Amino acid sequence: MVPGEENQLVPKEDVFWRCRQNIFDEMKKKFLQIENAAEEPRVLCIIQDTTNSKTVNERITLNLPASTPVRKLFEDVANKVGYINGTFDLVWGNGINTADMAPLDHTSDKSLLDANFEPGKKNFLHLTDKDGEQPQILLEDSSAGEDSVHDRFIGPLPREGSGGSTSDYVSQSYSYSSILNKSETGYVGLVNQAMTCYLNSLLQTLFMTPEFRNALYKWEFEESEEDPVTSIPYQLQRLFVLLQTSKKRAIETTDVTRSFGWDSSEAWQQHDVQELCRVMFDALEQKWKQTEQADLINELYQGKLKDYVRCLECGYEGWRIDTYLDIPLVIRPYGSSQAFASVEEALHAFIQPEILDGPNQYFCERCKKKCDARKGLRFLHFPYLLTLQLKRFDFDYTTMHRIKLNDRMTFPEELDMSTFIDVEDEKSPQTESCTDSGAENEGSCHSDQMSNDFSNDDGVDEGICLETNSGTEKISKSGLEKNSLIYELFSVMVHSGSAAGGHYYACIKSFSDEQWYSFNDQHVSRITQEDIKKTHGGSSGSRGYYSSAFASSTNAYMLIYRLKDPARNAKFLEVDEYPEHIKNLVQKERELEEQEKRQREIERNTCKIKLFCLHPTKQVMMENKLEVHKDKTLKEAVEMAYKMMDLEEVIPLDCCRLVKYDEFHDYLERSYEGEEDTPMGLLLGGVKSTYMFDLLLETRKPDQVFQSYKPGEVMVKVHVVDLKAESVAAPITVRAYLNQTVTEFKQLISKAIHLPAETMRIVLERCYNDLRLLSVSSKTLKAEGFFRSNKVFVESSETLDYQMAFADSHLWKLLDRHANTIRLFVLLPEQSPVSYSKRTAYQKAGGDSGNVDDDCERVKGPVGSLKSVEAILEESTEKLKSLSLQQQQDGDNGDSSKSTETSDFENIESPLNERDSSASVDNRELEQHIQTSDPENFQSEERSDSDVNNDRSTSSVDSDILSSSHSSDTLCNADNAQIPLANGLDSHSITSSRRTKANEGKKETWDTAEEDSGTDSEYDESGKSRGEMQYMYFKAEPYAADEGSGEGHKWLMVHVDKRITLAAFKQHLEPFVGVLSSHFKVFRVYASNQEFESVRLNETLSSFSDDNKITIRLGRALKKGEYRVKVYQLLVNEQEPCKFLLDAVFAKGMTVRQSKEELIPQLREQCGLELSIDRFRLRKKTWKNPGTVFLDYHIYEEDINISSNWEVFLEVLDGVEKMKSMSQLAVLSRRWKPSEMKLDPFQEVVLESSSVDELREKLSEISGIPLDDIEFAKGRGTFPCDISVLDIHQDLDWNPKVSTLNVWPLYICDDGAVIFYRDKTEELMELTDEQRNELMKKESSRLQKTGHRVTYSPRKEKALKIYLDGAPNKDLTQD
């Protein structure tokens, strides 16, 4: 407006007030809406995506106002999961059958409240396919890769400083979509294999360096010269191409680490990013030899500096030139409490010279004397890419732990390095080069580089301190024109955590758009300059030495600058500028990615379900996993299952079909008649991660027809019981309805098995040992307790047994025995040539020797010699085939409570139950013999049993094992002709693996004649409980075991009532073993082939289950108060000082001398040792260490504590026993001769007290060393305390300052301690390098053979290595 004019527009006063009032009204309306929204009830919606097997366990949570339209709910769900709206349905999931519910209308304007959503409650919804088609994924999300499917549900990551313990860095500009889709940033992340964050940050930095990426692209891989798997440059090339072209959110680095020669365990080793940088550059230089890129690392990253020393008297200067790839900057000077404030200050300190004076004076070549001198470093040349390492890890000598320095150190965005270059270097005439190591030492300029190997990622990220005041100053444009050493910061590698472990990520500036990005493994997000300032660490202001421990643990660790030189600064190659081989590689990777995408789509539409099949000929249930595309028809799926189960050569395809099956309940749910062309996705209810049912490939014979299984039917396995033959047949399957009555059910069974329904008795086994007679004809099956899968026993004989009470009937006894019978496989001992008298000669004096002859008669044959197992089996087989239950009852004087039931489905009965056999006694004779026997023989030894034996489990013998007759399913057609029916579970009892596992470990209980109170009165002398006499069922038959059981070994297959006691079980086995039960042992064999002896005679076999293996070993069983002891020979001067001799039996109250007397004949016969009783001793054995010497008058359990599986040393003496009293102390001494570099053999020294002076005197006596020259040390580790002769002279604690042996640091309080001693005047032998190496090899070989080398030491850090040949085992000699 021109000054002086008055044409300015001024509103009238009423218009102004009206406008202001309208604004106030609008604001008030908005506030009211907000207030109403806050008061409005909200609806919590929990949506489960059931369309994808990988997301079915994830849930999406939305908390919306109740007035929200339904269409808005669909929009929010679509945005949350990344689907196109309208391509999916939402149905109710609040326990409602979704098949009967119509999906919500995605176009409806109804509010959630009107659509029956409940405010204040959880409303569950299922996201399902729409019209059988899976939802369409948004293009952005489809490029995210497999792992993005999961990330749709994880929500935003915790913000920095929010109190979480995550070490992931998240910027202030963070948003959910910024890490989800590549399109937001244009960059791809790297997947962290385990602890490879340090690798990811370096790889992203190299990728974002134009000069390095362009040079890498120009290198061409020759596949004919090298394996692509082990080529590091090629794998880096592939990785960079994927980072540039992939549509995934993150890609794997496993191919790169595999080219390093790393295995999967290396991914769990956390290393230092600077260490990796050096090692990777070295590896690349080796791989790029004789190529255009041979000098690439040096051209980009290598600088030069001068290491000089100048004499302060004459000015003479000696120097050498070193090269460096990075400059290590100290955070805090040694001994100082203040850290450097900035990188510039640390750089000045780096080149600050030090004065060499006093004892550190420098010998000047010109002055020919020691003079004061100045020593320092000067930069001669800075690299194009300048790398600065901030040494944040230090060692605290107070706590003797490594620490991290979190002090604040600022760094500028632009760094002027011209002030640090040495411009006076070439002008000094008095200089002389000492060495030029530039070509040889291409490393750091300092040798105090710290290489940190983090093995435990237990660092805690305390967050970044929010104080951001910085001393950063940008260099002006005029400065850029004057200087050519202006460096621009473009990468900050950040460490978050502690010295013990942490997390690396990188903040990198893109030269394409000048924006900063955070590359945190697979997450890439845009950040600001303020986020970079937060990585300076600590907080401003002065602090104490330890104050940094309480500041931020997230700070910069490595900085990379690029020289600002327009002539050299490169840009990234565009796609059209790629070399031809890179274009081919891009095309190849795109094809692979498309193939992976197609494969993922196939996986996404593949139904994976368990498949079972009962093999038609082997009758074995097979299991597999059927993977079928949802669009495949049922007919095609049957063909796939048919081939999967390898039935092509067994049965025709048209004799197979798939049915719905519940393996847990062993139940056929339904068949699919007429649905052969229906897609599997529709039959199975869609693609799901898990299904609540399985599929069974059912087979039939060519002359059979398939039954129809309808939903709602229950499956019943019917076992036919024959009371006369005492057999239980294998099951046949019938299907019934729960609303049928018992009468109707009998008629149904009658048609199937052709038994009269009028006299039929049906017993339902609802669970183990729960038998229920269906006696009320009008009751329905549901009222009787039938479920989806049931088991019944049917009997229809015309005997009078049905008139008896069910609990007293023969039927109940037979079923009870059937339920409690288990099958065991018993390995009999090898027939030893040792006579029976020798076997029994090891009994304790005065035990039961008077009954030995009588006991021998029980197991002798007619000719007075022991029968072989084969003879017993053959004789028993012939004589006992026709033995019936009535004969057994007669033998038991008609006592029904003690009757032993028999059946015709076994071949062999225990000869103990045979009445007329001459091979054994009958039951009455057996009982009479047991009653007159020594009751001590059958008392249990509680402490000798393993805890494993306490683990109880229940299992019943399979019906197909116990049955001798088999029935086939038949139905009658209209013409009364029998039509055979195929049944998927015909003539086979399928035991569910899940059900079997569920029953494992459960303790079985059963009622006996008297309640078990745990007292001895409940057991008779034989070890059988008084209520157990009725549980005497035992059948045995020969069994052909697998090859490899050994000559002379025989197997028995035994069917036995598991309620029988171990004592009775052993008595039944006596005729087969050939010795009395007191002279053999029973070992239970577990899955790992471990054997544990069963010794508790009063316990039953309830802890055994079907098909358990038992090993019988000859040897006297333990009596009460006896213990089995393993005897080892102590050979102190042998290479293996511990040698097993034999197993012996020691008894409570026995003296040591008595046990030695019993050992003498056993040692002579079994070990060939002829010993006199006074020329060997017994002593305590603690693992491999010899302990207390047992004196002859010591009594077991009084003076010596003894336990099961006890071990003892037997030591042969050279002379008379010197140990006479427990007050004496026996130690093993060994002389070390340093002048000869060898150890003398052990010599025992017996001390009368624990005095050190007495020990010295004894050592002086046996060695001839003067008393004052004796030095001794206690051995370390287990006996014989082996140590290398190269280490013994300085590693042991020689000549401890103590007066007695039982104090620290010796603590010698028991016999068997090892004492090394030497002559202090004896000089150590001087070894040449050749002698030392030779001796080192010998000692290493010796110690490895003995296995006694003490190898304990704190865990050493594992050096980071890259193996150029891809084989780490070839690089073991490298440091």
From Swiss-Prot:
Residues 188-564 form the USP domain. Residues 425-452, 840-859, 880-968, 983-1024 are annotated as: Disordered. Expressed in skeletal muscle, heart and testis. Residues 1007-1020 have a biased composition (Acidic residues). One of its GO terms (molecular function) is deubiquitinase activity. The modification Phosphoserine is found at residues 832, 910, 933, 1013, 1017. Keywords: Acetylation, Cytoplasm, DNA damage, DNA repair, Hydrolase, Phosphoprotein, Protease, Thiol protease, Ubl conjugation pathway. InterPro entries: Papain-like_cys_pep_sf, Peptidase_C19, Peptidase_C19_UCH, Ubiquitin-like_domsf, USP47_C, USP_CS, USP_dom. The modification N6-acetyllysine is found at residue 122. It comes from the Eukaryota. GO terms for cellular component: cytoplasm; cytosol; nucleoplasm; nucleus; SCF ubiquitin ligase complex. The modification Phosphothreonine is found at residue 1015. Its EC number is 3.4.19.12. Belongs to the peptidase C19 family. Interacts with BTRC and FBXW11. Interacts with POLB. This is Ubiquitin carboxyl-terminal hydrolase 47.
